Amino acid sequence: MAENRALRAKHSILELCKTPELAAQVTLQPIDRFPLDAAIIFADILLPLEPMGLSLEFAEGEGPVIHNPVRDQADVERLKVIDGGELDCVAEAIRQARRALNGRVPLIGFAGAPFTLASYAIEGGSSRNYLLTKQLMYCEPKAWHQLMDKFARVITG
């Protein structure tokens, strides 16, 4: 959609996700243009990674890149368990989108599962074979379980 491309030309993915007005605007664009059954909030499953202490970037042509990936127990221990307040931008985008939708269609939200978040955090981005994830899982089970627990608490908090 042209209006989406215009916003993307001015703002990064993270900027669109972290700015409630922009995220709500992107959420509403398809609803305002097409007769759809529901709206999906514009966000990304990796948003919790930054406030937890990981450096996240959406590199052009590469997708998400974590510049300080989790590789061992010490890295897991450094990750903060954040509360909902750390992602107020998403909650505010949801409020704004719901207000603008005014009941026309339902608003769908989503979150990344602990394994998915861990895989990105460990691999440093997307992966085809998840070798580093498997390595941590099998060679450092204590670190793996602690990481799963942290991500589970973050996405349910």
What function would you assign to each model-found segment?
Residues 57-157:
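Active-site-proximal, glycine-rich beta->alpha crossover segments in alpha/beta enzymes
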Residues 1-60:
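N-terminal basic, low-complexity leaders that serve as flexible interaction/assembly modules and, when applicable
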